[in-house]
């Protein structure tokens, strides 16, 4: 058996990432988060991340503020919004941190 050369994976820090906002229509509280853009499909990537938040809240019973808000107000009361598309993981983390400090979202605390 011959060893095949391994394909190099694309570095994750070179991908596009999203900074997104989840807003509860009931009380106006919101959450700022990030996720990577999968195959250039921004909305699909945000939907994938939203489903992960729902699993954490509804299936796994997580106790973070976002999960508690999802259980309290129902998933239908939340809207999703893409705020920025950023090239690179670190740049996206930096922007997320800045927005959280600036906007003080209740569900991130």
Task: Specify the residue positions occupied by each region the protein language model found.
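Structure-specific nucleic-acid interaction/processing domains
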Residues: 2-109
């Amino acid at each position: 058996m011959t060893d095949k050369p391994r394909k190099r994976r694309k570095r994750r820090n070179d991908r596009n990432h999203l900074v997104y906002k989840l807003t509860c229509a009931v009380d106006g509280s919101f959450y700022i988060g990030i996720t990577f853009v999968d195959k250039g499909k921004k909305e699909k990537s945000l939907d994938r991340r939203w489903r992960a938040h729902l699993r954490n809240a509804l299936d796994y019973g997580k106790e973070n503020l976002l999960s508690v808000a999802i259980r309290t107000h129902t998933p239908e009361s939340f809207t999703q919004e893409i705020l920025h598309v950023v090239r690179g993981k670190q740049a996206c983390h930096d922007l997320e941190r800045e927005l959280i400090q600036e906007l003080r979202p209740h569900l991130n605390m």
